[in-house]
Amino acid sequence: TPSAGGMFKREWWKRWTAMPSGLTDFIQSWDCTFKDKDTSDFVVGQVWARKGPNRYLLDQVRGRMSFTETLDAMRGLSAKWPQTTRKLVEDKANGTAVIEVLRKEISGIIPVEPFGGKIVRAHATTAVAEAGNVYIPAANIAPWVHDFVEEMAAFPSGAHDDQVDCYSQANAYYNDNTFDISALIS
């Protein structure tokens, strides 16, 4: 049952070994938590893009970070992926502080008001993964992908849900913004 974990099945995730051409709508999704660094949740930033109906997780940063480390991580990911036109940041608690500081120096920071609870938000994005439309890096490209898959598989009963939150935020954005610009540029 979803309450016992297993909302996202391990076999749902498709793998990419070379970044596909023709990707569009590059975004970042951020879950910002900074408290006591030894026991706090993780700060997670993900880079996503899409091609047709498919969504691609391209990169991720994850760690227990202070406020200044979180700002530096977002600056770094934005510099590494300048094609990310939107940076989605949950406008709650720590995310609000990040938004206030970085929107003065990084373009495209979009405050996101979360809907429902974590389980509701995650469940709203299961169909695209179950349908085989979510691609994640192969393990030899991104060593962190194992932890991503395991956290997703354990949700909502796992110890952490920060990567789930980022995934849900990015894919809820794509679900709500289905316009495919690639049809105009091909």
Question: What are these model-predicted stretches?
Answer:
Residues 3-4, 15, 170-186:
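Acidic two-metal-ion nuclease catalytic site recognized across multiple nuclease folds
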Residues 25-27, 44-155:
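Mg2+-dependent endonuclease catalytic cores in nucleic-acid-processing enzymes, primarily RNase H-like
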Residues 29-32, 91-92, 163:
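Generic detector of well-ordered alpha-helical packing
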Residues 30-43:
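An active-site-proximal beta-strand-loop segment
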Residues 137-138, 159-163:
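Short, charged, surface-exposed loops that flank catalytic or proteolytic processing sites
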Residues 166:
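P-loop NTPase catalytic core of nucleic-acid-dependent motor ATPases
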